[in-house]
A protein has these predicted regions:
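Acidic, PIN/NYN-like endoribonuclease modules and their adjacent C-terminal/linker elements
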Residues: 108-135
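Histidine- and aromatic-rich ligand-binding microenvironments
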Residues: 5-6, 35-36, 100-101, 122, ...
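Active-site neighborhoods of divalent-metal-dependent phosphate/nucleic-acid chemistry enzymes
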Residues: 70-117
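Active-site-proximal, substrate-binding regions of enzyme catalytic domains
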Residues: 42-87
Length: 135
């Protein structure tokens, strides 16, 4: 099984919640684990808002980098992200959710690129065939 781990799942793992323990178990059982580089930026933003000390932030980002393959955006992924974003917008409207972020589309495009499942608790992903939903 191949995984793409999003910000939601990583944060739950760092908090030590039941969802985080499930994330840890999924990671330990996976064949290949990827984290889009934008997830690192999302996590940095969250922890800066919460005023987490820089050493702890760096340690968490290093955990992600040493545990997974950190993937970037190339031209092909960028091209695939556009229609995936529109797909997520339509899904959000049907579900009466706020608009998804472009980050969500990049995460889903990455999962599709690498034939992976997205580990998340983000409602924008609920019900998608690629999703392992944390609940």
């Amino acid at each position: 099984m191949n995984l793409v781990v999003d910000s939601y799942a990583w944060i739950e793992l760092f908090l030590g919640t039941a969802k985080g323990e499930r994330t840890r178990r999924l990671i330990s059982e996976a064949d290949e684990i990827r984290t889009p580089d934008i997830v690192l930026a999302e996590i940095s933003r969250k922890y800066h808002r919460e005023e987490l000390d820089p050493q702890s932030l760096r340690a968490r980002l290093e955990t992600i980098s040493s545990t997974t393959i950190v993937t970037g955006i190339d031209m092909d992924l960028a091209v695939r992200t556009g229609p995936i974003y529109l797909e997520l917008v339509k899904k959000a409207k049907r579900g009466r959710l706020n608009s998804p972020s472009l980050f969500d589309a990049i995460i889903l495009a990455t999962a599709r690129e690498y034939d992976s499942s997205v580990v998340t608790g983000d409602e924008h992903f609920r019900g998608l065939p690629e999703t392992i939903f944390l609940h």
